[in-house]
């Protein structure tokens, strides 16, 4: 059975956990902004692309993907908005993996 071609915008431990749960037949490309992000993804069944991309870079890199899962850090709002916009242009399914808000208890 042929799997999906998935792009994961990494940058959190949730991205690593997500990739670990994806079926082996899926072809996963993880996008990490830094070399440190790449080291966190070592040992996962994915290809890792390192470096910050602008909208044109994502337009090129995401062509041919079946879906994009944005598991970037909550503070990485620029990459989230850029990827969301590019996915809309390419009519590519976009999913945001979010974190639950933690409220400080006093």
Q: Where on the chain are the PLM-derived regions?
A:
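Extreme N-terminal starter segment of soluble prokaryotic enzymes
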Residues: 2-6
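Short beta->alpha connector loops
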Residues: 11-14, 52-54, 73-77
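Phosphate- and divalent-cation-binding pockets in alpha/beta enzyme and binding domains
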Residues: 17-18, 39-40, 57, 78-82
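Glycine-rich, highly charged phosphate/nucleotide-binding loops
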Residues: 44-62
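Glycine/small-residue-rich loop that forms an oxyanion/phosphate-binding "nest" at active or ligand-binding sites
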Residues: 59-106
């Amino acid at each position: 059975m042929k799997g999906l071609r998935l792009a994961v915008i990494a940058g959190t431990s949730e991205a690593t956990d997500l990739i670990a749960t994806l079926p082996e037949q899926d072809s996963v490309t993880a996008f990490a902004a830094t070399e440190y992000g790449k080291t966190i993804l070592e040992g996962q069944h994915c290809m890792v692309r390192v470096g910050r991309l602008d909208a044109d870079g994502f337009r090129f890199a995401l062509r041919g993907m079946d879906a994009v899962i944005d598991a970037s850090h909550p503070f990485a709002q620029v990459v989230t908005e850029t990827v969301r916009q590019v996915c809309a242009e390419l009519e590519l399914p976009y999913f945001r993996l979010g974190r639950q808000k933690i409220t400080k208890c006093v």
